[in-house]
Amino acid sequence: MKIIDLNSAGGIGANCLYCQVGDFHFVIDSGLNPKQVGRSATPDLRPLVGVKLDLIFITHCHLDHIGSLPLLMRHQPNTPVIMTLPSRMLIERMLHNSSNVMVREREEKGIMEYPLFTHDEIDRIAPRLLPHPLNSPKKFAGAQDDIEFTFHAAGHIAGACGVEIVHKHRRIFFTGDVLFSPQRILDGAKLPRVHFDTLVTETTHGATDKPPGNLRSNEMIRLIDTINRTLLRGGSVLIPVFALGRMQEILAILHDARKFNRLGAAPIFASGLGMDLCDYLDDISKKTGLVHFTRTILKELKIKKSPRDLVPGKEPPTQGIYVVSSGMMVEKTASYTLASCLVGNAKHSICFVGYCDPDTPGGHLQAAQNGEEFLFAAVNVKARIRAQIERFEFSGHATREELLDYALACQPRSIVLTHGDPPARAWFATQLAEKLPQAKVLDPVPLQPYQV
């Protein structure tokens, strides 16, 4: 197999892998790098010049995996795009939201390249976005060659899948983003533990030791305890969340706690894209049974819209639990503004429930010490950190030990490392060299072709 990583910045970003098996050409994912802006955030598609792709696979609907898909499809006007049914139900909504954000950033930040694609273009490509069920092998004839592919549930978020490719007698597996343990609203990954000639694996947590005893169930209890203690001292709780997956999981956890009288009495506020996606997950749950979330949760929690009259740096008008995006507290989002309102008072808590890039405001706040001054530059607020800042392990990614165990179970002849920062990939390269010495381990340099 020939493989080229089109994510020019490497690491975790504009995920996009170009592969050729025999005379069959395909791409896995086409994302945007959240650390970049404009065209620099997109994959480098120059290696595809003159190439007619037979298929494009989408592993899941996070923007670092789908955010540049309309651009790729623009250059491949006849290529079908295949994904799971839940991903097909989500993808248009996620792309339309991305276009809206780019229009706003063009106006606010003067990024004249934005939007990279329009709502009309999303509507035009929609007929080429095709669903395919899990665990259902399908033969696909390309222009000059054919393959068989199978999707396997990868946990992570609704619709996430690993992709198994069979070409002649060769078996290849792409894990995508994977979580083996179950979440409150989603079952864990069910990946095939069989021999593969080539394994292409994510490495997100390769540099992260598994904290002892941090089972998701324990973290749920710790989160509810933190909320209750905050409410008892008269404070409010901010829970910054990713709109797709994490918001719905946190709302389900709050619903469970309230149902069993384990959550203090306080209004719960939520708004934005995540609330809209609650409808989508409710629909996915009803149609596929692959998600465990219903709109009944919102009704029984009596969710209120987040107040629009928040003044940065000033106390919110109502004590409550605020479940809002963005998860990394990106500037000019609801979580960013609310953090500026709460961080200076010791009665409040800010509870992070997902990964924060160290270069984002959320990452900066987690790294800061209590008593330090913290600048919310986008709203011109400077406050001394007094609030309780907590991080909870609700990761959507497998531990490095789980991924290593999976690689050992598959006994591949070659392993390709993807979706990880350099230290994460280095850990896997070292461990695999020791435990699978017969396997060729490849950490691809972006835009360089490799034969595996």
Predicted regions, residues:
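Core dinuclear metal-dependent hydrolase active-site scaffold
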Residues: 1-51, 131-187, 313-315, 321, ...
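Pre-active-site segment of Zn-dependent metallo-hydrolases
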Residues: 9-14, 21-79, 83-125, 180-188, ...
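Short, solvent-exposed amphipathic alpha-helical segments in soluble enzyme
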Residues: 20-22, 166-168, 189-193, 253-260, ...
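Active-site neighborhood of phospho(di)ester-bond hydrolases with catalytic His/Asp-centered motifs
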Residues: 28-30, 53-62, 69, 81-84, ...
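Metallo-beta-lactamase
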Residues: 95-157, 286-318
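Cap/insert and terminal regions of metallo-dependent hydrolase folds
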Residues: 181-270, 349, 354, 373-440
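Hard-cation-handling environments
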Residues: 223-361, 418
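C-terminal helical cap/extension that packs against the catalytic core
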Residues: 282-320, 370-411
